[in-house]
Structure formats: structure tokens, C-alpha cells
């Protein structure tokens, strides 16, 4: 029997990357998976893959930055399922924009709208479907919410906000039997990384990945399924006494005092396979 047998799980941003991997893992563990994403074609591919593997999945269009879209999404889920047990707020965007005085206001607003406000909106309209039976909410934050990156003030602000919003929600809903936690991934091999840094086949992308091998104590980028299994822990009864927490899954980057030292330390380079 799977760890999520007879549970209904809603996952946003599940067309690709961490969300897609989590949808597949949850379905394999017995959950009925409801996927929401702005990318209809890729979202349907995720649903088809789950069904071909014997799982239960369905999808509804969702733009987390649009309140009316979120309301409609929640209404569709209520009509289809009545209640839900798990909400994984995973939808997000990222883009460099320069230093704060150079940073485009519309880019800052866009990242806040999708990443932070989107997490708030989906929680606001889907939590009512959890109040009767309780459950688990998981929010995707980032190691960038704990420590800042150059030229990414919008993303840093959004993810830092998600980490603290998670704590606020955990306090608000603990007595309703709803646990709320966040995951802070490190650098994960997803289409978002391809967009930000280049693909493995491109020189820029290859250099980025090589640098991350040095910076990351475990010596590699993470894989989407490794984040999905963290989400599975938080969604399941295995974490029944865990709420208000942020789990950092970054290969050890945040444990190091000065990760930049790894780029110039010859001994570390020699030990990096």
C-alpha cells in the first residue's frame, strides 16, 4: 500500500521539473493527482505518463498570478473531488534583472506575482477544501530565500517571503490539522536551469554545471525526483509531527561558510570528480 493511498493531491507548476517529478511520485504512492499549470500541452503529457503507468491524474488550466484563474481552478477541484488532502504550491519563475537600481519594475512584479502571490492565492482558495479533514501543504521556496544571489533581488524577495509565509500558515492552521512546510531546493537539473544558465550542450550551460560541481559539497546538481521524495515525506504521515519547517535540499551548499572558496581551492578541485 502506497504512502498516499486514497489521498487527493493538488500540484501547481507540474508540467515540468520538480512539479512533474512530484506528480509522478505521488501517483506511484497511490494519490489521485490534480495538476495545475499554465502550459497545457506539457501538463497533458504529465497526465498521460501517469495514467500509462497505472496512476490517477487529471489537469486543469491554472495561472497562479491571476486571482480569477485560481478561483476557477479551486471551483473545478471542488466539483471534481469535494475535498483535498495535499497541496503542493510549486509554480514559480526566475530571471536575473541586474542590481536593484537597474532591476525592471515589471520583472520584479512578475516574479512576486507568480512565486509569492501565487502561493498565497492558491493557499487562500484551496485551504477551504482541506479544513474538514486536515492535510499537508508544501511550498517550494529556495536556498535563494535564505541567502541572496547577485542580480536576482525579485527571486530572493519572493522566495524569502514564501519561507516566512509558510511559518505563518503553519501557525494559522495547526489546530485545523493542516501541516505547512516548505522545501528549499538548491540547483536542480530542470528546464528552468536550462533557461537561466543554458543547456548541457551549450558552452555557457556546461560551464555553469562544472562550477556547481565545485560549489556543491556533494559535487553535482540535484535531480527533480530528489526534491519529489522530500515532498513525499512532507505530504505523508511520516512527517506527522513536522510543521512550520523549511527543508533545504541543496547538496550541502548552505552548510558551507564560504562556497566561493571552493572555486579557487585546488585541493577541492582535485577531489571533484
From Swiss-Prot:
Taxonomy, superkingdom: Bacteria
Broadest EC class assigned to this enzyme: oxidoreductase
Key word Iron present: no
Classification via InterPro entries: NAD(P)-bd_dom_sf, Sc_DH/Rdtase_CS, SDR_fam
Sites where the protein binds substrate: 142
GO molecular function: oxidoreductase activity
Listed EC numbers: 1.-.-.-
Transmembrane region(s): none
Active-site residues, as the UniProt record annotates them: 155 (proton acceptor)
Entry keyword annotation includes DNA-binding: no
Record's keyword terms, sorted: NAD, Oxidoreductase
Any matching Pfam family: adh_short_C2
Residues that, per the record, bind NAD(+): 10-34
Family: Belongs to the short-chain dehydrogenases/reductases (SDR) family.
Protein name: Uncharacterized oxidoreductase YxbG
Amino acid at each position: 500500500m502506497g504512502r498516499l493511498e486514497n489521498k487527493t493531491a493538488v500540484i501547481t507548476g507540474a508540467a515540468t521539473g520538480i512539479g512533474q517529478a512530484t506528480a509522478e511520485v505521488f501517483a506511484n504512492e497511490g494519490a489521485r493527482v490534480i495538476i495545475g499549470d499554465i502550459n497545457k500541452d506539457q501538463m497533458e503529457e504529465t497526465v498521460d505518463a501517469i495514467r500509462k503507468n497505472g496512476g490517477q491524474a487529471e489537469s486543469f488550466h491554472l495561472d497562479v498570478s491571476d486571482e480569477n484563474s485560481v478561483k476557477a481552478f479551486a471551483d473545478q477541484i471542488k466539483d471534481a473531488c469535494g475535498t483535498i488532502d495535499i497541496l503542493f504550491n510549486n509554480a514559480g519563475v526566475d530571471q536575473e534583472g541586474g542590481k536593484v537600481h537597474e532591476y525592471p519594475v515589471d520583472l520584479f512584479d512578475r516574479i512576486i506575482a507568480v512565486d509569492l502571490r501565487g502561493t498565497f492565492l492558491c493557499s487562500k482558495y484551496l485551504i477551504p477544501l482541506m479544513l474538514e479533514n486536515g492535510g499537508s501543504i508544501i511550498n517550494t521556496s529556495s536556498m535563494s530565500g535564505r541567502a541572496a544571489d547577485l542580480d536576482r533581488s525579485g527571486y530572493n524577495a519572493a522566495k524569502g517571503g514564501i519561507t516566512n509565509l509558510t511559518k505563518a500558515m503553519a501557525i494559522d492552521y495547526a489546530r485545523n490539522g493542516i501541516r505547512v512546510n516548505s522545501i528549499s531546493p538548491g540547483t536542480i537539473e530542470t528546464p528552468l536551469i536550462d533557461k537561466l544558465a543554458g543547456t548541457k550542450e551549450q558552452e555557457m550551460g556546461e560551464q555553469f554545471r562544472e562550477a556547481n560541481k565545485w560549489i556543491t559539497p556533494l559535487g553535482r546538481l540535484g535531480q527533480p525526483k530528489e526534491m519529489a521524495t522530500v515532498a513525499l515525506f512532507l505530504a505523508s504521515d511520516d512527517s506527522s509531527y513536522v510543521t512550520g519547517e523549511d527543508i533545504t535540499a541543496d547538496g550541502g551548499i548552505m552548510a558551507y561558510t564560504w562556497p566561493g572558496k571552493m572555486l579557487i581551492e585546488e585541493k577541492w578541485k582535485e577531489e571533484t570528480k
